[in-house]
Curated annotation (Swiss-Prot):
Family of this protein: Belongs to the class I-like SAM-binding methyltransferase superfamily. EEF2KMT family.
Species, as recorded: Mus musculus
GO BP term (any one): peptidyl-lysine trimethylation
Record's protein name: Protein-lysine N-methyltransferase EEF2KMT
Superkingdom of source: Eukaryota
Keyword field contains Cytoplasm: yes
Pfam families with a match to the protein in the record: FAM86, Methyltransf_16
N-acetylmethionine: residues bearing it: 1
Localization of this protein: Cytoplasm
Length: 335
């Protein structure tokens, strides 16, 4: 195999691996590139390698995606193989038969590979919106903010982080595993989200026992119920956060106003220096960020856009327009 062909196959394998483990939509996979590779004599070897990096991946074997997702993926993989004149691959059909005998669950798993070789695995609802909340799944801005954090660990290392609207927990778990914060406070307000969030924290090897990290090198991790409309200044002050983050929480006008209210309280209640604040959001319409910026300006909170980062670790929609704003809160009690 020519060097460029080997490089292309490696890139293709990585794309299939990352997308499958994260259970991304099947149309987003590089099927056309696979079709071209299957014309080569080594096409069957590539398919077997894809099988090992997806359905047979150790992470997937332990915490796989939904049964329906795995079935559809294997069916499409088999169809691509059958479209070329070559011998059948028993391994593909055996894998499909095994999946067909597996019972479906209301929960599925998505896993995201980190540069260290570690991974973050989330248990998520098989429905996009369930129990009346959008917090049970991972949205693209959470992935984008996690990538930025991994590329800029100094912003989080040995610091206390408060995350507003943690949802399924992807961003925080990635930061805890890759950036070594002193402490990390996940927060949300919906009971179903908090239940799943606690489960995901435990699933990834962290302890929720106060002051009892799993080992000497672990961060102290807590999960807090935080209603933005009811939280008090004293509650926020008790967290003593050095950094505050939020991702994909600007999905309606009311939430935007509530978030700015919390940010103003954080600005007013700090005993010493105000925390660094990073808010990531996907621009779904012209109004998505416009209202937030208008409210920040009205509240006197300075903001600046963080330059786009270069490393793309996680599979999310290429066309997604995602922004990270760094907010500067001026502590009234600063030194």
């Amino acid at each position: 195999m020519a060097p460029e062909d080997h490089e292309g196959a490696t890139s293709l394998l990585q794309s299939f691996e990352r997308r499958f483990l994260a259970a991304r939509a099947l149309p987003s996979f590089p099927w056309q590139s696979l079709e071209e590779k299957l014309k080569d004599p080594s096409g069957s070897e590539l398919l077997l390698a894809i099988l090992q990096r997806t359905v047979k991946h150790p992470v997937c074997v332990q915490h796989g995606p939904s049964v329906k997702y795995a079935r559809c993926f294997l069916s499409k993989l088999i169809k691509k193989h059958e479209a070329v004149p070559t011998e059948p691959l028993d391994a593909l059909y055996e894998a499909l038969a095994e999946v067909l005998m597996t019972q479906e669950s209301t929960q599925c798993h998505r896993s995201y590979l980190l540069p260290s070789g570690n991974s973050v695995t989330l248990s998520e609802s098989t429905a996009i919106v369930s129990h009346g909340t959008t917090g049970l799944v991972t949205w693209d801005a959470a992935l984008y903010l996690a990538e930025w954090a991994i590329e800029n660990p100094a912003a989080f290392t040995d610091r206390t982080i408060l995350e507003l609207g943690s949802g399924a927990g992807l961003t925080g778990l990635a930061i805890c595993k890759a950036c070594c914060p002193r402490a990390y406070i996940f927060s949300d307000c919906h009971a179903q989200v908090l239940e799943q969030l606690r489960g995901n924290v435990l699933l990834n090897g962290f302890s929720l026992e106060p002051h009892t990290p799993i080992d000497a090198g672990s961060s102290k991790v807590t999960v807090a119920q935080l209603d933005w409309d009811e939280v008090t200044a004293s509650q926020l002050s008790a967290f003593q956060a050095d950094v505050v983050i939020a991702a994909d929480v600007l999905y309606c006008w009311e939430m935007t106003l509530s978030l700015v209210r919390v940010l103003k309280m954080l600005e007013d209640c700090q005993r010493k220096s105000a925390p660094d604040v990073y808010v990531a959001y996907t621009i779904r319409s012209q109004d998505t960020g416009k209202l937030f910026i208008e409210e920040l300006d009205r509240a006197g909170i300075y903001w600046e856009e963080v330059p786009p980062h270069t490393g793309k670790l996680f599979p999310y929609e290429e066309h997604s327009a995602i922004v990270i704003l760094k907010l500067v809160l001026t502590s009234r009690h600063g030194v």
